[in-house]
Amino acid sequence: MTTTIELADLPQLSQISDLAHSIWRDYYLGIISRPQIEFMLAADYSLDQLEKDRATGTNFLILKENGQAIGFAAFHTLNPSVVKLDKLYLETQHHRKGYGQRLLQATERAATEDAASLLLLNVNKHNVRAIAAYRRAGYSHHQSILAPIGYGFFVDDYVL
């Protein structure tokens, strides 16, 4: 099997949108409610929103296995020394193959190329599999946040 990670171009944002919708509906049910999943997908993963994110400095990486998109990451610079990992998602059937770690490492490399000394990320407090993966990669709990995102929904995250 051949896997590649590449900087996503504008046409690949539609693949990222499709992946996000599939992954979130499969993975997050049981962590957050279906209405919150649909709200967050509409707010953050529409093609229009992804294009706006890219136009304002968000970088997208796309992970492919044998040419097929199976995961992605997105990150942006907060300030000259800090990069924020906004998104890192992988199709569930590809978990536990090291692909998530490869996406994380690719993001870390991109951050250091930009001279950042810190990579921050948020993870839902109930996403125990992702928390464990980030801890294995050396990340630790920095702070907790509970913030409204609209329509009665909240993010309940750890910042690592």
Give the role of each language-model region.
Residues E91-Q93, K97, K125-H126:
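Active-site acidic-Proline motif in GNAT/NAT acetyltransferases
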Residues G98, A115, G138:
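Short glycine-rich hinge loops at helix-strand junctions in the catalytic core
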Residues E51, V83, S117-I131, R135-A137, ...:
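C-terminal "cap" of GNAT-fold acetyltransferases
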Residues R96, Q105, A132:
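Substrate-recognition "cap/lid" segment bordering the active-site pocket of phosphatases
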Residues T3, L7-L13, S17-Q93, Q101-A110, ...:
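Acetyl-CoA-dependent GNAT
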